Structures are given as structure tokens and as C-alpha cells.
Amino acid sequence: MAGKEIQTPDQAEAFVAKVFDVLDSYDYTRFGEVLSTDLKYEGGLQKTSGLDNFINDIKASTQRMPGLQTSHSRYRTELTAEGTIYSEGHSNASLESNPGKVVTVPMIGVFKLDSEDGKIKEMRIYKDRLPFLALHQALPGMKANN
């Protein structure tokens, strides 16, 4: 489903589910299915413009955190009359090197769609990044901040 076809909250939820399925796959060849080439992204400490720059930033992050696995769950998705999607849920992250440790934080996603191709043109993700610091410090060779 292209974003420009979204007219109901159920359609918005299905679209957001696909977005997180694509992002959590870390299959960068699929990112263009849901993200516009002129994407503007802001989340955590990251702010970037352009799909290629967004992908390069994600690649750099995953290189610093090998074996990173993420998933996202949603408990509420809202669609405004202007077509902006608000999604509330949780972001989960774990590392292959520490499979028993999963960090879960509340998250809000804001997605503005391109009226031409229905892909996400602006994406903002709000979540507390601090709990992920402990996960990062659990990586081999990293020093815990005691």
C-alpha cells in the first residue's frame, strides 16, 4: 500500500507496520519502498537529509553495534486530516553478543508523506536514547560507565 492511498487509521497502521518491518530488516535495498529519496529524518542524536545519507548513517551505527537487532511495536496509530501519521509504541533493541538483554523504551513516530509517491518525506522518532547506552557499553571491548 502506497502512503497516498491512506485514508483510515487501519490503513495508517498497516503502512507503519510495513515501515518498521522494512527498517528493522536492515535490508537497505528495501528502504526506498517506504522512504522518499529526499527524506528528512530526525531522531535521537541523528538528523539527516536524503535517503542515501540516512542509509549511510544507519550503516555507521550498525557497524559500531555489530549484531544489533531491533523491533518496534505499536499500540496506537493516528492519522490527521492532512495525512500526517502519529504512531505510539515501543522500540526494542538487543545485540547478538548479549541475547538475554533487551532494551525497551517508549517511542513516538511522526511520519509526513509525499503527496506524489506516498512515501515518507519527513520522519521524526522520539525516544529516550539513554537506556541504549548500557546496551552499547555491553559490547565487547567497550568500557561500562561506572
Curated annotation (Swiss-Prot):
Coiled coil: none
UniProt keyword list: Antibiotic biosynthesis
Keyword rRNA processing: no
The organism's place on the tree of life at top rank: Eukaryota
InterPro entries, alphabetized: NTF2-like_dom_sf, SnoaL-like
Gene3D superfamilies in UniProt: 3.10.450.50
Pathway: Antibiotic biosynthesis
Transmembrane regions listed in the UniProt entry: none
Keyword Nucleotide-binding: no
A Pfam family it matches: SnoaL_2
GO BP annotations, alphabetical order: antibiotic biosynthetic process
Record's function text: Part of the gene cluster that mediates the biosynthesis of sordarin and hypoxysordarin, glycoside antibiotics with a unique tetracyclic diterpene aglycone structure. First, the geranylgeranyl diphosphate synthase sdnC constructs GGDP from farnesyl diphosphate and isopentenyl diphosphate. The diterpene cyclase sdnA then catalyzes the cyclization of GGDP to afford cycloaraneosene. Cycloaraneosene is then hydroxylated four times by the putative cytochrome P450 monooxygenases sdnB, sdnE, sdnF and sdnH to give a hydroxylated cycloaraneosene derivative such as cycloaraneosene-8,9,13,19-tetraol.
Name used for this protein in its record: Sordarin/hypoxysordarin biosynthesis cluster protein G
Organism annotation: Sordaria araneosa
Gene expressing this chain: sdnG
